[in-house]
């Protein structure tokens, strides 16, 4: 009987790779196969599994669409809990079941939240009186109460085909004595005529009154609520920028919170060095943000973020130019169609969201990965990047971004890496970027000139992405993006009468 009860609780989940799994039954079967009997250790395993799923953002896509990430997380868990390679398939099934469970739970919670909001909105609309304008000859207060009661009755008793019930039916069925024995006074003829007009307006809110055709019943639309959602998006994005600019989470703590450090994804020796490079580049970008005057002013400004639309455009165009440059310089050996496809993928909302998470998720205490991708995560990235370009110029701001984009491309598109030629174009190493940054700190000193769009590739303080043996005549060869970025920067700088003297808080 116990086995039958347990089997009845098993519910089917989606399939991934090897077939259909059952979340509850599969987990217990695999746990028995692994001899995972220690409850304390199992709870630790479950929490670590959810932590990795959240850090990699696996819950945003179907399990069948991210085999590599699932395999990587399974490898991490298997190595951390000291299981041999022979149990790789079992750990992959455990991760797959967890991903499917998290996706189901989030869908349910979102549906419940949406239903609750609809109920609240519906309740607000029902509380709004739908009576016509008051008249001096409407009768006594008791008669008004009777008319409102009559109106509610007509709304509730109206059939599906919206046929208007007769007034005699309403009066006979609804104007009955109350339970305590009190009776309502008879409804005056004038009130009945108003009730009839009101009921007809419920069927056609756009229809005018019989007397006074320009008077219409005011409509209350629930669809006005998305305006509040836009304000909420704006408030959340502003609060995240404030946390990042003011360094609400110290850098040492951010390193511990950094969800993108993946030491156990592979056994290759170069993995650790890549993590250090990414971490150093992120700290370099954060230090620029902390010392950026434009970022500070934006975080203190009480206006809506729409006031910084041109700054957001500057960041967006600069990021697109940076992506085009990385693809053109680092993967020039690929066919033209492949480069075009790679540029489109790197310019997608999904990739920009991952880039934004990689930079800013450890710097905020909010659930950054669960927020709206386009309206919050990518918008924060564009606003901050536009501020950095305005304060520091293109080269100093985008050089670390180019390096990060390059490594993310190799990680997400390993076939590109495997098909590379022996001497491909690629960005400077992290040490070169950091040394170049230290040599260009004087660019932010008082009295500096307005940042230019291009710099010579032969200058000593250049941080552009070049090959040692190949001269690159211009940092941004994409004329359209170059022109848009330059125009945005010129407009943004023209908002101040004098150039700022220092970049400090």
Swiss-Prot record:
Positions of region (Disordered) = 1-23, 105-179, 421-460
Tell me its family.
Belongs to the VHR1 family.
Ranges of Basic and acidic residues composition bias in the record: 1-16
GO biological process: what's one of them?
A: regulation of DNA-templated transcription
Give yes or no: UniProt keyword Membrane: no
Query: What would be an example GO MF term here?
Result: DNA binding
| Upper classification of the organism | Eukaryota, Fungi, Dikarya, Ascomycota, Saccharomycotina
User: In UniProt terms, what function does this protein have?
Assistant: Transcription factor that regulates ERG9, but seems to have a more global function in transcription.
Bias (Low complexity):
133-148
A cellular component term from Gene Ontology for this protein is: cytoplasm
Q: Which organism is it from?
A: Saccharomyces cerevisiae (strain ATCC 204508 / S288c) (Baker's yeast)
Indicate what this protein is called per its UniProt record.
Transcription factor VHR2
- What's a Pfam family in this record? Vhr1
Which UniProt keyword terms apply here?
A: DNA-binding, Nucleus, Transcription, Transcription regulation
Q: What is its main location?
A: nucleus
Which stretches are tagged as biased composition: Polar residues?
421-443
Miscellaneous notes:
Present with 1730 molecules/cell in log phase SD medium.
Q: Where in the cell is it found?
A: Nucleus
């Amino acid at each position: 009987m116990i086995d039958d009860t347990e089997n009845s609780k098993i519910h089917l989940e989606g399939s991934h790779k090897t077939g259909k799994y059952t979340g509850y039954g599969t987990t217990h079967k695999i746990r028995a196969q692994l001899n995972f009997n220690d409850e304390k250790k199992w709870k630790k395993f479950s929490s670590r599994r959810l932590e990795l799923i959240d850090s990699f953002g696996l819950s945003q896509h179907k399990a069948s669409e991210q085999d590599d990430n699932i395999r990587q997380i399974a490898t991490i868990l298997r190595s951390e809990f000291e299981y041999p390679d022979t149990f790789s398939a079992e750990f992959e099934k455990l991760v797959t079941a967890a991903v499917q469970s998290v996706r189901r739970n989030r869908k349910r919670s979102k549906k419940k939240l949406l239903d609750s909001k609809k109920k609240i909105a519906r309740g607000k609309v029902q509380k709004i009186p739908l009576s016509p304008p008051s008249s001096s000859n409407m009768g006594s207060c008791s008669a008004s109460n009777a008319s409102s009661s009559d109106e509610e009755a007509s709304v509730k008793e109206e059939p599906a085909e919206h046929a208007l019930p007769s007034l005699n039916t309403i009066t006979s069925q609804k104007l009955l004595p109350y339970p305590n024995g009190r009776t309502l006074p008879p409804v005056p003829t004038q009130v009945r005529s108003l009730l009839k007009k009101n009921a007809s307006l419920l069927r056609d809110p756009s229809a005018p009154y019989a007397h006074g055709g320009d008077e219409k019943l005011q409509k209350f639309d629930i669809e006005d609520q998305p305006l509040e959602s836009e304000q909420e998006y704006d408030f959340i994005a502003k609060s995240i920028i404030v946390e990042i600019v003011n360094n609400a989470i110290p850098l040492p703590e951010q390193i511990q919170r950094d969800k993108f450090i993946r030491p156990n994804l592979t056994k290759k020796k170069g993995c650790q060095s890549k993590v250090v490079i990414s971490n150093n580049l992120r700290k370099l970008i954060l230090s620029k943000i902390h010392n950026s005057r434009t970022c500070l002013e934006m975080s203190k400004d009480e206006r809506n973020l729409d006031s910084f639309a041109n700054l957001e455009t500057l960041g967006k165009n600069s990021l697109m130019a940076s992506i085009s440059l990385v693809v053109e310089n680092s993967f020039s050996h690929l066919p033209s169609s492949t480069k075009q496809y790679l540029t489109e993928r790197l310019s997608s909302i999904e990739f920009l969201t991952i880039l934004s998470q990689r930079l800013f998720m450890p710097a905020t205490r909010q659930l950054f990965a669960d927020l709206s991708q386009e309206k919050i995560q990518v918008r924060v990235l564009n606003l901050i990047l536009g501020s950095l370009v305005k304060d520091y110029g293109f080269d100093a701001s985008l050089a670390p971004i180019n390096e990060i984009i390059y490594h993310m491309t190799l990680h997400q598109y390993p076939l590109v890496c495997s098909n590379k030629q022996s001497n491909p174009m690629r960005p400077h190493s992290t040490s070169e970027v950091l040394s170049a940054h230290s040599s260009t700190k004087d660019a932010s000193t008082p009295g500096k000139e307005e940042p230019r769009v291009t710099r010579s590739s032969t200058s000593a303080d250049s941080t552009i992405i070049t090959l040692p043996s190949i001269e690159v005549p211009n940092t941004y060869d994409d004329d359209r993006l170059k022109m848009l970025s330059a125009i945005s920067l010129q407009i943004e700088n023209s908002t101040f009468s004098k150039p700022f003297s220092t970049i400090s808080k």
